């Protein structure tokens, strides 16, 4: 949420300094002093980037079922060794939850925002090179630009491909999307009075 707040509310103050938003990294009670100064734009970008680093360290790069224990990512092997248990939390049913690739894509958007001429200032050291490097890490997931479909930008016109999307799987060009649903009344059916 800090990214969207930063995008909507950052800008130059009357003294010419480039300001971001208040950085709140802990619970704030109703009786707290909300009259706090805004952080600089760069401090906000750095804070969001640190949050994304922590997310990437904890999350899998992608979710999906596995069949053997050696497919469990190394960072989770001290927690779980049974593939069936891993699949409950990190398998196909977890697709469309935030994952490491989504964190990488948000970093790419963040650095693109930070490099924008709208936010250029001596205090903001982020450049187009930072944005390009972050975007390259996202493209590495599909083995670079060559891994993208040559007709990917028109996937939405391919009814067969759309009809075959299930269990949260995505075409190569889509990182995160709403699950395809043929009925939106599941909640109502399950919770009928």
What role is predicted for each listed range?
Residues 3-193:
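Structured, solvent-exposed acidic/aromatic patches
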């Amino acid at each position: 949420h800090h990214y969207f707040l930063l995008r909507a509310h950052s800008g130059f103050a009357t003294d010419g300094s480039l300001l971001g938003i208040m950085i709140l990294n802990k619970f704030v009670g109703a009786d707290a002093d909300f009259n706090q100064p805004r952080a600089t734009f760069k401090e906000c970008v750095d804070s969001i980037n640190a949050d994304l680093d922590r997310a990437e360290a904890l999350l899998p790069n992608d979710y999906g079922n596995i069949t053997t224990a050696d497919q469990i990512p190394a960072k989770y092997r001290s927690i779980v060794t049974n593939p069936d248990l891993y699949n409950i939390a990190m398998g196909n049913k977890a697709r469309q939850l935030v994952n490491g690739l989504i964190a990488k894509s948000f970093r790419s958007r963040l650095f693109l925002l930070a490099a924008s001429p709208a936010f250029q200032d001596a205090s903001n050291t982020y450049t187009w090179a930072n944005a390009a490097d972050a975007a390259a890490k996202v493209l590495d997931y599909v083995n670079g630009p060559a891994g993208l479909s040559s007709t990917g930008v028109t996937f939405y016109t391919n009814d067969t491909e759309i009809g075959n999307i299930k269990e949260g799987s995505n075409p190569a060009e889509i990182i995160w999307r709403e699950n395809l649903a043929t009925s939106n009344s599941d909640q109502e059916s399950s919770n009928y009075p």
